[in-house]
Amino acid sequence: ALDFAGGTVVHINSGVAGLVAAYMLGKRTGLGRESMAPHNLTLTVVGASLIWVGWFGFNGGSALGAGARASMAILVTQVAAAAAAFSWLVVERVVRGKASVLGGASGAVAGLVVITPAAGFVGVGGASVMGLIGGVVCFWGITALKRLLKADDALDAFGLHAVGGMVGAVLTGVFYSDEIIKAAGVVLAPTFAGQLWIQVEGVSATIAYSAVVTFIILKVIDLVIGIRVSADDERMGLDLSQHGERIE
């Protein structure tokens, strides 16, 4: 399967693992009764900005050398992130009546995730479309799909990373550039449909592997030391209860 920088092994894997962990851990105390909205959007924007810039190294570095392919990977990473942030904000405005800073940051991350498997295989046009699609689908992932799954996925690991990784991995088989593929010496399936099916198989295998292995690992940890802190520690916050410090 085509996966340039880890759309399957990093994002689908971690997103599915997060969902399994959320089910096994259970919901946070007070969820649904207390406001749990992000309380420091300044840190959110700073963090998203650092991730955005760092992703250039993540995707560009997967070319394993400074050259045309690395440059294109960095360019399409920027394009996809911007396109996804835009489409996310548009959908958010339509659905909720207003766009938000948090939405813009989430949309950018969605675009970064979506382009990860495709960064070394697509051009600017393909990256733009993938970003636009990814922003919309990931918004659905953290809203309607999240409600359907009924999991307390606090950081939207599944809705952003797993869903975004799935979208990116499948669309890589749709929007790859023949010119870039040939220049890189990548061997594809004999037909377009065949390559697309390989992408779907890769996604499915990653989901199954991650879900099973995560369940086994967490089950063992739960039997040995447990995977959830006490209710008092949870309310106090893990920074303070586990480490004796807190950043206000």
Show the residue positions of the predicted features.
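Glycine- and aromatic-enriched membrane alpha-helices
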Residues: 1-248
